Amino acid sequence: MKIGILALQGAFAEHAKVLDQLGVESVELRNLDDFQQDQSDLSGLILPGGESTTMGKLLRDQNMLLPIREAILSGLPVFGTCAGLILLAKEITSQKESHLGTMDMVVERNAYGRQLGSFYTEAECKGVGKIPMTFIRGPIISSVGEGVEILATVNNQIVAAQEKNMLVSSFHPELTDDVRLHQYFINMCKEKS
């Protein structure tokens, strides 16, 4: 099994460490050639936290947006954390256009931003159990479509969800010692292969 990690910007190295800890090979995807070269070998894709506007621009500049979108729509399992969640959203409240736009949800950028600051909590995540959650100016999921399963909420806000082959979290599971959400994603990848 090999998981691709979008490595344009953001917390990609931390995800690679978690996958290594779980005995799963990972590859950093920095440009279209990397993605096309490894695409047929990939069991899944991680879109890490970072700055979503910058990542969206880099995806477009590197001509990676449409090929990644097509792969996700064709069933490639994807795990978007924080900015990665924003990249997957069909609608972003503060922007006119989405990026990949594959997951039926509306998100609000930086909802856990300046007004609330970064914070840590623990909460139940369906199919995983009670897990630590680190929020760093994270987004919230304002609403989801019928096909989206809500996996976790904090203070009545949706912070983790799944739609078919797409898993998202507002928080950064790669910044804790708890690997269960990554294991959940690996299990999704195994089911698809």
Swiss-Prot record:
Catalytic residues in the record: C82, H172, E174
HAMAP family: PdxT
Pfam families membership: SNO
Binding positions (L-glutamine): G50, E51, S52, R109, I136, R137
Organism: Streptococcus pneumoniae (strain Hungary19A-6)
UniProt name for this protein: Pyridoxal 5'-phosphate synthase subunit PdxT
Pathway membership: Cofactor biosynthesis; pyridoxal 5'-phosphate biosynthesis
Alphabetized GO MF terms: glutaminase activity; pyridoxal 5'-phosphate synthase (glutamine hydrolysing) activity
UniProt keywords, alphabetically: Glutamine amidotransferase, Hydrolase, Lyase, Pyridoxal phosphate
Summary of the function given for this chain in its UniProt record: Catalyzes the hydrolysis of glutamine to glutamate and ammonia as part of the biosynthesis of pyridoxal 5'-phosphate. The resulting ammonia molecule is channeled to the active site of PdxS.
Superkingdom of this protein's organism: Bacteria
Cellular component, GO annotation: cytosol; glutaminase complex
